[in-house]
Each structure stands twice: as C-alpha cells, then as structure tokens.
C-alpha cells in the first residue's frame, strides 16, 4: 500500500511539473517584454506618505526590471475612469493613457461592467502564492474580481481617540450617539462623498438595518426606504450633537486629524488601523493617540490595482503589480515609519524571517471585519 502511495505521489509530481515549468517560462517572457517599458500608474496622491512609498516602488522596479514607472497622482480615481471611458468611446483599443490604476469598488464595477478591464491575470502573478485568501481578495464591494484586480493593501474603518481625553471610547452606534450628546460639538465625520465619511454611513447602516442581507445585493427601489430607514432616524438624532450641529462637516480625515490634535474634536476617523501609530510616530498626532472600532465589527476591504483592457504596457503593469505583492514591498508598506498600510499577505506563507517581521507589523486586536455593501 505504501509503495502504491509513493507511486501515486511521483505520478502527480510528474504531471504537475510541466505546468510549473510553463508558468515559469510564461512569467520570464512577461518580464522580458516588460524590460524598458514605461508604465503609467494612476494612483491617489492625497497623502505625502503614500507618495513617498510609490516613489520608492518606482526606484525598485527601475533597478530590478528596467521599468520606468511614472506615477500620475489623482485626487479621485473617477477622473482616470472617465479618461478610460473616453478612450473607449473614441475607439482607442490599444495604447491607452493608463497602464495601472489604484481603484475603488464603485469604479471597478463601472469599468468591469463595460468590459474595459483586462481579466484573468491577477492570480497568475508569482507572488499571489503569498496572498491571505481569508481576506476578501476575490471580491470588491461584493463584485467578483475574476482576476481583473490584484490586491496590494487592506483597510478597516477605524476610530482614533486620545487616552488622556477619552479613556473609554464608544464601541457601538448607540454608544457613539451617547458620547456625542455627552460631548456636544466634539464629534463629526468627513463630508461625503469623501470615502471615509461615506464608509462611516455604510458602517452605521450595516449595524442598524434589520435587513442586512439586502446590502449584499444592488439596491431595490421597492425596499430601499425600509432598508435604510434606521440610518436616517439615527442621523436625525446624531447630527444636532455634532460639530457645528451637523450643518457643516470637515472636508477630509486629514482635517479631522488636525482638529483632534488641536483639541477641537475627541474622535477622528481613518481607513487604516495603523494610521494612529504612524501619525503619532511622525508627530502629526499626539503620542497618546490610539485606535478602536465597534465591538461587533467595522467595515473592511482590500484595495486593488487593475489594468485597463487598452493599456499600452500590459507586461510592465503586471510586473509592477507583482512587485507590489512581494514580501519586500509589503513589509516596507506595513512599516508605520514608512506608510503603515496593512499587508494582504499571509505571514504563514512566508519564509521564517519575513513571517515574523510581517506578523509583528500587522495591526493587533482589531474588531471583526464587516463586508462592504454592494458597490451599486
């Protein structure tokens, strides 16, 4: 029996060996094609920390792969999406202006539905083998990615407070309402359509609605009012206790950080669980700043890069996406002194030294991750 098992194992290895060889050959061909290419990477440029990290990525892919990575800072990925749509309408099926795009779920759905994205490539990247498959890396805002996006960071809606000011933070919507009423004018959220402000509203809707399953599907006109009614009632109660009585809102989480630092606010918001640590280390937030979330869970997601179907430098874009998934790049990105963006890799899939380093860099004691509502 043992001899039969050994024979079966050898046969399986022999059958799989050509597949591994072909995959290696295919990737080497992609790297060869990428050599010397210019890759235009459209990415959110609203944080100097992120910009410095991407500048480092540009240096590394130049050094290792002879790729000229040009970062195109955008205020909103929707601007790049409109450009891709305009090129498609003009019949520009090749040689597009965007090779790689940092994209959110709503814009991903828009491009995917219009068949404007390259599909089926992400899980063929060599560094995909390190990805934590327990994270939502195969869907984006409840839309299946189908290999059209490669993950490169994870995020979770997180509150920030100061221990000297708020030793016991609110950890539920009801506690947040009571906290705001107890400290009028010291709580707020970024004005939608700011991503973080919108995420807080989605977080509250998930926690308050009595029809949570409906949020995993596109909104239905017949049920929308009933599904969302608890949120509107809650906001009607919350807004009078907010900063400026809920008649005005900060433009961004960065503005909330500044107001927390000044003592105007007691809470700030971020989508990065390591943000408080990173900003305290840089002196942009007080040293007693800490992160927390709702006990029942907070909204979480993965951020992705995608390749338009009409990209000029497809091979180069794949090589850059693969580098973004490398343990080296992910460890550097997770370092609070660099960016502090949580990794999408599974430490258990890494070699010993990198495994320990990544495990130490991951956020600790996070609340459960709640799936985002459907992108529609």
Where are these regions (language model features)?
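Bacterial N-terminal signal peptides that target proteins for export
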Residues: 1-9
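Extracytoplasmic ligand-binding site segments that recognize negatively charged/polar headgroups
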Residues: 44-56, 72-79, 94, 98-254
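Extracytoplasmic/periplasmic substrate-binding proteins
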Residues: 243-308, 349-350
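Short, well-structured alpha-helical segments in soluble
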Residues: 84-93
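Mature extracytoplasmic/periplasmic domains
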Residues: 298-299, 303-372
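Short, polar/charged alpha-helical segment
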Residues: 27-35, 42, 47-68, 159
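Sec/Tat signal peptide C-region and signal peptidase I cleavage site
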Residues: 19-23
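Bacterial N-terminal signal peptides
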Residues: 8-18
């Amino acid at each position: 029996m043992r001899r039969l098992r050994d024979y079966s194992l050898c046969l399986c290895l022999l059958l799989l060996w050509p597949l591994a060889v072909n995959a290696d050959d295919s990737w080497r061909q992609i790297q060869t094609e990428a050599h010397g290419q210019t890759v235009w990477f459209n990415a959110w440029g609203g944080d100097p920390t992120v910009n410095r990290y991407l500048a480092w990525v540009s240096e590394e892919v130049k050094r290792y792969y002879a790729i000229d990575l040009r970062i195109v800072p955008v205020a909103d990925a929707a601007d790049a999406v409109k450009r891709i749509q305009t090129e498609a309408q003009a019949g520009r099926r090749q040689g597009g202006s965007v090779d790689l795009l940092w994209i959110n779920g709503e814009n991903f759905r828009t491009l995917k539905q219009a068949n404007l994205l390259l599909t089926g490539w992400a899980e063929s990247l060599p560094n995909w083998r390190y990805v934590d498959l327990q994270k939502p890396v195969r869907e984006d805002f409840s839309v299946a990615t189908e290999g059209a996006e490669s993950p490169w960071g994870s995020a979770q809606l997180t509150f920030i407070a100061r221990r000297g000011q708020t030793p016991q933070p609110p950890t539920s919507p009801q506690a947040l309402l009571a906290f705001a009423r107890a400290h009028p004018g010291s709580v707020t959220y970024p004005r939608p359509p700011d991503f973080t402000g919108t995420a807080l509203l989605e977080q509250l809707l998930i926690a308050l609605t009595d029809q949570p399953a409906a949020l995993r599907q596109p909104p239905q006109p017949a049920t929308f009012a009933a599904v969302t009614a608890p949120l509107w009632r809650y906001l009607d109660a919350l807004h009078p206790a907010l900063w400026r009585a809920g008649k005005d809102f900060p433009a961004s989480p960065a503005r909330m950080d500044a107001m927390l630092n000044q003592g105007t606010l007691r809470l700030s918001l971020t989508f990065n669980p390591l943000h408080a640590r990173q900003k305290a280390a840089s002196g942009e937030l007080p040293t007693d700043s800490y992160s927390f979330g709702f006990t029942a869970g907070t909204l979480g997601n993965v951020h992705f890069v995608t390749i338009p179907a009409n990209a000029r430098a497809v091979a180069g874009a794949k090589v850059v996406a693969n580098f973004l998934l490398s343990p080296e790049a992910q460890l550097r990105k997770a370092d609070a002194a660099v960016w502090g963006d949580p990794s999408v890799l599974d430490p258990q899939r890494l070699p010993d030294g990198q495994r320990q380093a990544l495990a130490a860099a991951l956020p600790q004691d996070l609340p459960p991750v709640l799936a985002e509502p459907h992108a529609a």
